[in-house]
Amino acid sequence: MVAEKPGQTVLLVDDNAQNLELLEIYMEDLPEVRVVTATNGLEAMSKVVQDAPDLVLLDIMMPKMSGFEVCKRIKADPKTRDITVVMVTALNEPSDVERAAECGTDDYISKPIERKALVNLVRNLLATKTKG
């Protein structure tokens, strides 16, 4: 198993407090990873600039700016385009997955989320970033 790079940061973005808390609890399985949170799309963009996360777990349906728009902006900016973005959403229609792909998302997970699967995905994506 490849250890995560010390100091790697994961940004969790969800407007639902319970969902955000659940994601934070899941990330406790990765104690070496720094976790920051945002509750809407505008706050997420601010945190992307401020905290330079290695990975963003991003809800789609949020106030102020959708996850689709956040992802587009992250991937369009040369300073942030290498940030890994994973959509974590209740939307699971093929058209939603396709739209997320068009925005540049690196992966897509439908809620409800299984803890071990999410932790393993985050661990693997962060390990891949250390090799690149």
Can you annotate each of these PLM segments?
Residues 62:
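Receiver (REC) domain active-site loop signature in two-component systems and cognate sites
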Residues 113-122:
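C-terminal output helix
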Residues 17-36:
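Two-component/phosphorelay signaling modules centered on CheY-like receiver
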Residues 37-55:
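Acidic, metal-coordinating helix/loop segments flanking the phosphotransfer/catalytic sites
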